[in-house]
């Protein structure tokens, strides 16, 4: 495990950028996750962990499992650790992993599918993904204007569903056509103020 001693550390800066910048997440294909529960969910799902940062003095068998999987391990004192977090009171572990890659083929035979268009609030999106998994939906389609499904707030709100529930991004017309071809009826609701 490498001890981070400077705010200029490349791994620390990488994690902080993953939390702040959608373009950076997209270019690296990684997402930022926080907490021991999420680390366990990532490991159980087979997600490819890249960088794991723990607070000085904190340990868990999950950290050893991440190391065995090939993740780079770092520790940092509280003041530096907080720089990588997106929350005011960070948990004991922050990590990056590869974003799950789902293609439109995940919709074939998926059964019930939830299609979302223009859902911009990250917390709401994460909660909906978590609920969709709880109701055993086969997939979720995100259309234009939806929040980034790999932003830290969405990932945190999913409580691990982001690793298990196929989440496909498609234009609305293409998604509707594909679902129709699969024999799925489309029902719509819209908020009018």
Where are these regions (language model features)?
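Short beta-strand segments
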Residues: 33-34, 55, 96-98, 117, ...
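RNA substrate-binding interface of SAM-dependent RNA methyltransferases
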Residues: 44, 100-102, 106-192
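Short, conserved catalytic or adaptor-binding loops enriched in Gly and charged residues
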Residues: 63-68, 157-161
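Glycine/small-residue-rich loop that forms an oxyanion/phosphate-binding "nest" at active or ligand-binding sites
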Residues: 66-98
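Short acidic-hydrophobic, aromatic-tinged amphipathic segments that line or gate anion-handling sites
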Residues: 3-6, 72-77, 165-175
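A short acidic, often aromatic-flanked loop/helix-cap motif at beta-alpha or helix-coil junctions
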Residues: 60, 79-84, 173-177
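Short active-site oxyanion
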Residues: 27-30, 48-52, 70-72, 139-140, ...
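Boundary-proximal intrinsically disordered activation/regulatory segments immediately upstream
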Residues: 1-61, 146-147
């Amino acid at each position: 495990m490498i001890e981070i001693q400077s705010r200029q550390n490349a791994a620390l800066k990488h994690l902080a950028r993953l939390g702040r910048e959608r373009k950076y997440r997209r270019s690296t294909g990684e997402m930022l996750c926080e907490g021991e529960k999420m680390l366990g969910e990532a490991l159980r799902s087979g997600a490819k962990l890249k960088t794991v940062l723990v607070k000085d003095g904190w340990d868990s068998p999950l950290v050893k499992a991440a190391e065995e999987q090939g993740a780079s391990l770092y520790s940092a004192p509280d003041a530096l650790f907080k720089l990588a977090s997106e929350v005011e009171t960070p948990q004991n572990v922050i990590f990056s992993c590869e974003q799950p890659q789902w293609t439109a083929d995940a919709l074939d035979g998926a059964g019930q599918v939830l299609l979302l268009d223009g859902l911009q609030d990250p917390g709401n999106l994460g909660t909906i993904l978590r609920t969709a998994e709880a109701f055993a939906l086969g997939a979720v389609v995100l259309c234009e204007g939806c929040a980034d499904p790999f932003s830290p707030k969405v990932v945190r709100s999913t409580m691990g569903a982001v690793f298990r529930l196929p989440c496909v991004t498609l234009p609305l017309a293409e998604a509707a056509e594909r679902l129709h071809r699969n024999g799925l009826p489309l029902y719509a609701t819209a908020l009018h103020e």
